[in-house]
Amino acid sequence: MDQRSVRDILAGKTYFIRTFGCQMNQHDSERVSGLLDSYGCLMALDPEHADIVVFMTCCVREAADTRLYGQCNSCKSLPPSPSGKRVVAVGGCIAQRDGEGLLTNVDNVNVIFGTHSIAHVAELIAEAFLDGKRHIRTNEHEDTDAMSMPWHRETQYHAWVPIMTGCNNFCTYCIVPYVRGREKSRPFEEIVDEVTGLVRQGVREVTLLGQNVNSYGRDLFGKPRFADLLRAVGDTGVERIFFTSSHPKDLLPETIDAMAETPAVMPQLHLAVQSGSTRILKEMNRRYTREDYLGLVDRIRNRMPDIALSTDIIVGCPGETGEDFEQTLSLAETVRYAQAYTFIYSKRAGTPAAEIDDPTPHEVILERFNRLVKVIETTAHEYNQGELHTVVPALIEGTSKKNDAVLLGKSPKNQTVHAPIPEGYSIDQLVGKIVDVDVDVAKTWYLSGSVVGEPR
C-alpha cells in the first residue's frame, strides 16, 4: 500500500499506546507514535477514545504474557471507537517471539508486528481498517532502519536516543537476543547529529539506549568506541547524559575514564551483576567472575567515588544452591547498591536455562528473594542518607502522584526528589527546569526537601 493510501485511511483516527517493559520499548512506542502522527493520526488519552490501540510488549518475564492477554481481552468491552471501528495491534518482543501463535491466545488482535518491523506498522494498521483481516509482520531481516524514524517524545526536556539494537551475548536465561536480534550499531555521526538537534530543540537530558551499550561500534567501519561516543555527545552541549544497559565484561577502562572526564555524564551507572556466585555466573554464560565484577566496581569508584551504582539480580536460577545465594547476598552487601531490580527467575521457552529442571521449592526461593530485598533496601537507604543536608539539583518532571502541590524531579544520580512547589511558581513554569533542593529527608527510594534559589 502506498503512503498516500495509508494517509487517506488513517488521517484523523485516534490512537492509544500502552507500553510494557524496558526503556527500549518506551522508545519503540515513541517511534510508533511518531509514525502514526506523520499520517495524520491523533493521540488519545485512553483506549476508550482510540480507534487504534497498540500494545508494545516485553517477554523477559512470564507475567508479561498474562498481562498482555488481559489487556487485549479488556478491549472487547470498550465502547465503540470514535470512527466506529477499532484496530488492536500488538508489537514488541512478544509479537516477535510468538508471531501467529498470539492469535491462539487473543482473538481480537488485528495487527502483529515484530521488533524489526516497526517502520511498517502504519501500513499494517491501514490494511486492517481496509479489509478487516489480520495482518502479521515479524521478519527478522527487515532492511528498513527504524532507529532513524521520526518519533513523538513524551517530554520536551528528555529524549531516549537509541545507539544500537540487539545483543550478541546469549545469556542462558535471557530471551532478548532471540527477539531483538544481533547487535547493530547506529552510525557515530548520526547519533551526535541527533543529540545536537535535540539540544537546539531544548532537550536537556538524553538517555543513550542499547541492550549492551559497551559493545557499541564493533560492527561499524573504523570500530568507533563507546567511550568516544560519550565524549562526543558530551560536546554537543546537552546537560545530562545517562545510558543503559552496560554488560560488566565489556566495560573498559577507557569508558570509565570518559564517564569521569565528561561533565555531562551523570554519576550513575547501571551494572547488572545477575548473581554473586562465580559458578552460577558461568552457568548463565555471563563471562566474568565474582572477583572480576568486584574489581570493576573498585576501578569505577576509584575514578568516581560517589557514583550511584544500580544493578539487576536474579534469584532462583536453575541449580542455584544456598551457598550460591549467600555469595549473591554478600556481594550486594559489599557493593552497597543505591538501587537494584531484583527478580525471581522466570523460565523463558527457547533459552538454554529453560531446559534445566530445578528441584528447589518455590518457598525457599521466595525466602531468599525477600532476604535480598531487605539488603537492597538497607543499602539504598544508607546511600540516600548520604545526601542529607546537601543541595541536590533536580530536573523537574511533574508533580508527585500523591500530592500535586509537590514537585517530582530526578537527581544526577537518578534519585527521585520531592519538594513543595515554591511560592510564586506554577508547575507549568517548572517542568523541564532544574531546581536546587536542600535535602532534609532521605528515604529508601526518594529524597525530599525545599527549593532554594531560582529555577534554571
Residue ranges and their predicted role:
Residues 1-216, 254, 259, 269, ...:
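Proteins enriched for Cys/Gly/acidic motifs involved in redox and nucleic-acid/cofactor modification
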Residues 2, 355-456:
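Terminal RNA-binding accessory module
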Residues 19, 245, 273-275, 396-398, ...:
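Flexible glycine-/small-residue-rich
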Residues 59-60, 180-181, 220-223, 282-289, ...:
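Short glycine-enriched, charge-decorated loop/helix-capping segments at active-site entrances
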Residues 85-92, 97, 200-325:
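Conserved SAM/AdoMet-binding glycine-rich loop
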Residues 154-157, 167-169, 265, 275, ...:
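Short flexible coil/turn linkers enriched for glycine and charged/polar residues
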Residues 171, 191, 208, 243, ...:
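Conserved, mostly hydrophobic/aromatic
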Residues 320, 327, 335-337:
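Contiguous mid-protein beta-loop-alpha structural module that forms a pocket-lining wall or clamp
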